[in-house]
Structure formats: C-alpha cells, structure tokens
Amino acid sequence: DVYKRQFVGIVGLIDPPRDEAITAIADCRTAGITVKMITGDHKDTAAAIARQLHLADDPKAMTGAELDEVAEADLPSVARSVSVFARTNPEHKLRIVRALQSNGQVVAMTGDGVNDAPSLKQADVGVAMGRKGTEAAKEAAEMVLANDDFASIVAAVREGRTVYDNIR
C-alpha cells in the first residue's frame, strides 16, 4: 500500500566541470573566441554549468522549443546573444550553426553522436570525439580529437595563430 511506505532519504549527485575545462573556456574568451553550449540537458542545469564554466559574463539560455518560436530572420541575432541552447535536437543544432555562419562567424562544432553529424558537416570545422564518438560523427567531421579534450581545440587554435603570425 502506498500510504504505508516510509521515505528513507534522497541522494543528489553532481559532476562538476573539470578545472581544465574552465581554464580552456577562459583561454577561449581571452583569445576572442565565443563558446556556445548546445545540449540535451534541462535549461536550468545547462545554465548552471555555463555559469560554473564562466561561459559568458551573464549566460543567456534558451530551449529548443523556444528556438522553434524564433523567426528565421531573427535567428542570427538570437544565436549571437544566447550562450546556452538546452533540450535541443539535431535540427536545432543545424539552425544554430547556420545562423552563426550567417553572422560571418567561423564556426567550429564539436560532437560525438550520430545526431551531431549534420551540424558537424555544416560547421566550418567539424570536430568529433575520437574515444566516445560514433563513426558517423567521425566521418562527418574534419578533425577528430584523439583525447576527447576540449582544451586540445584551444591549443590547436593557439598553435595555428602562432604559425599564421610567423608567416605574416
């Protein structure tokens, strides 16, 4: 009987962002690189993680359902101003990448699943995860991260900029 049950307790778990991720985001921001989070997580959870990562000074979050209500003409400015896109599907990811590109931005997109393949292919630089990534994601991407570490992208950009500066 439901009424004779006794509540014993509750457990909460958290997987906090790694220090390396926080440092990598800070390095991106210092280098003028804007990082967006596109996730299937709940909006409040994603926004809390974005704040822990210092993704933006005041990270704005939007759900895929809210994104569906945005007119195509308004999407580029929304994509520019929103830091976190939560509860998204593959079509949302693709719309976000295209909207950022329409702003003249060079877009690097990371992903590991079959559902990421269309946006990895659309991005200027698709980056798949080498360890946990699916074959579909790896085939759609231009680059595969052998160690699945976001900080590797930051290091690659830094190295590329150094080479570019030395050539000039």
Pin down the residues of each PLM region:
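Cytosolic catalytic headpieces and adjacent flexible linkers of membrane translocases
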Residues: 1-99, 103, 117, 131, ...
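Residues at the starts of beta-strands that form the adenosine-phosphate
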Residues: 34, 106, 125
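Short helix/loop capping segments that flank catalytic or ligand/cofactor-binding pockets
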Residues: 47, 108, 153-154
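Non-transmembrane, extramembrane segments of multi-pass ion/lipid transporters
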Residues: 73-76, 101, 121-125, 131-168
